[in-house]
Amino acid sequence: MRKLLALVLNVALRASLVLFLADAILNADDSRFAGKGIGSRGLVILPLSLLLPALYLTRRRGEPYPFWMDNLYLSIFALDLAGNSFDLYNSYRHFDLLPHAHGTGAATVLFAWLLQRPMLSAVGLATALHVGLEAQEYYSDVLFGLANVRGTWDVVNDLVVGVVGSAVYGAGYLWLVRARGAGGTT
């Protein structure tokens, strides 16, 4: 039953990515999407959404497909895109703190699991990735006139909640791994 639920959720997440991106492209002038470069992001998000299946096919053949980890990975993109489609970024000033906390926290777990690295290393990798993403958001606004960042306070708060997300998700993952007696370097 858990495998079926994981598969259904995986298909739903993948379908939601396509639907959210189609909505953003077809309604690019809508205030939910205007000035955010979501169509361009889609060119990056869709190929990135296939990263875990590609890694599985090349490195983990013979093992069961890690649907729950793939779902965690896909949820990073789905939450970000849902925030735009449902106009949450514009309606709630601090909504973006949720995707930043979740995205960095989820990346921490994925790095620890996928790379079999100690949790502190995974936190460092996820935080470095998050700093790079935040810099990309800021400089795409400055250089290309987009509207993803509301000011320095927005950048600082996004980075702070990213670190908090890494700590919370990392601690949760360590607890689950230990509770299940699973192996791996964490």
Regions found by a protein language model. Name each.
Residues 2-102, 109:
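"…centered on the first transmembrane helix and the immediately adjacent amphipathic helix/loop
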Residues 3, 73, 127-130, 151:
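Generic alpha-helical structural signal
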Residues 5-9, 129, 157:
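Physicochemical signature of membrane-embedded alpha-helices that form the seven-helix bundle of GPCRs
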Residues 82-138:
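Membrane-proximal helix-loop-helix units in multi-pass membrane proteins
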Residues 87-96, 131, 135-167:
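Interfacial helix-loop-helix junctions of multi-pass membrane proteins
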Residues 102-117, 142-148, 163-176:
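Membrane-interfacial alpha-helical segments at the cytosolic side of multi-pass membrane proteins
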Residues 174-185:
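Membrane-interface capping segments at transmembrane-helix boundaries
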